[in-house]
């Protein structure tokens, strides 16, 4: 698979690699996400890391596998979809996210994500 910003983001998220995610994200990121319970926003890398690792995939959530990553161009945007296997004290789950993003200066400057939630396999 050819590397893309979106697929690199998905791999770094699966590894919970905040250093790599910070390299991929523009300092002026415009991020919005939608989960099954609410909408989320971040406007800088610190807010985004807090959202990703304190709210979406907390310490108790171990990403044990990457089931799928696919990306494609949608006109001037990239679309990336990824599915993770996640384990936590409540059991084993699949989590899928679909994201659209734009790039500036080689980094993600705009991103919209929709999440399936933690679903039983």
Which residue ranges define each predicted feature?
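Short, mixed-charge, low-aromatic patches
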Residues: 3-13, 36-39, 53-57, 110
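Short, low-complexity N-terminal intrinsically disordered segments enriched in polar/charged residues
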Residues: 1-28
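A beta-strand edge to alpha-helix "cap/lid" segment located at domain peripheries
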Residues: 50-121
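A solvent-exposed, acidic/Ser-Thr-rich amphipathic alpha-helical stretch
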Residues: 18-20, 26-73
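Alpha-helix C-capping/helix-to-loop hinge sites
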Residues: 12, 32, 86-87
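Soluble or luminal CAZymes and related metallo-dependent hydrolases
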Residues: 1, 5, 48, 93
